[in-house]
Amino acid sequence: MKKLLLSIAFLLPAMGMMAQTQVKTAEGILEGKDLSGITVFKGIPFAAPPVGNLRWKAPQPAQKWQGVREAKEFGPNPMQEPIFGDMNFGTKANSEDCLYLNIWTPAKTMKEHLPVLIYFNGGGLMAGSGSEPRYAGDAMARKGIISITANYREGIFGFFAHPQLSKETSYKGSGNYGFMDQVAAIQWVKDNIEAFGGDPNRITIVGESAGSMSVSALMASPLCQGLFAQAMGSSGSVMGFKKIATQKEAEEKGVQLAQKIAEKMGKETGKKVKKNIGMKNLDELRALPAEELMKLAGVRAVPVYNIDGYFMKEQPVDVFAKGEQTKVPLLIGGNNQEMTPWAVLMGKQPT
């Protein structure tokens, strides 16, 4: 009996140091996976699936679930074409239902109040995913920082403005859905991260390339006041050489794209297409399967973020000039000669 009690006494401290694999969030209980002392929670829904009537709308709250939800596999990547050769993903699936985040935490209890890092992937706002191995947060977690990656809508699904879409909103604007997804992800983290051992008042947002562009956009957005404490961006900003498109300019590009898609649909089906179908009704575009819409949009679906009057109310450079951005410490950087190949090739493909 003494030996048994002694064994239990030795085991109790070790059990206290075991990773916390079950966590209760606002939506329900999640079960993660122990990874040699840290816990990984993958595929956590931070918003409702943006499908059907929610296509081209601001993200809506995630749905609650009963029982324990396994969070051991990545959720689907955002819809995208394989346009960058250096991208590998933790899951092969691409889907319009993509609003998931992943958490690597070293915390053993919810009382540790560890610093939190949220990373937004690069990819020109057209490609990329939080499941990419290069963004895995285990190394950061082993240094005592809760590391998070979050997906957001890309391409035509995340940055499509149109007059009919603008009529649907209270602010009479459209587009920027990918940026709004990022806001929703940060808000979810702020609301729930204490359960994972994190400090909601010590959130740092980080990004590279398009992720860095996102960081600058988020800092300039009135929707982000009070959501994060620090920001880091590398190799990208929305405050570049050109001004951001106005709502009217973005809508005009959206109408042109919708018309081109309609014309392609007409050629494939043999039906005649009305001249202004791109200006009239978006029901057909909303009803298209995601794969078909992406194929029809093609390279013309280059993301056009804009001054929508909601996420972005004025040019970010003006917001910063007036000191009205989210006032937090900002670390920015770039890479040595990162633009040299583009300058030499002048946009041409290497041979």
Regions from the language model: what does each represent?
Residues 105-113, 191-199, 222-225, 319-325:
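Surface-exposed acidic, glycine-flexible loop patches that form ligand/cofactor-binding
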Residues 191, 217, 225, 239-351:
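Substrate-access "cap/lid" subdomains that shape
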Residues 201-245:
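Primarily recognizes the serine-hydrolase "nucleophile elbow" in alpha/beta-hydrolase
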Residues 98, 171-194, 249-257:
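Alpha/beta-hydrolase active-site loop
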Residues 1-21:
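Bacterial Sec-dependent N-terminal signal peptides
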Residues 20-176, 200:
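Non-catalytic accessory segments of hydrolases
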Residues 122, 177-181, 209-212:
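Active-site loop->helix "elbow" adjoining a glycine-rich segment at hydrolase catalytic centers
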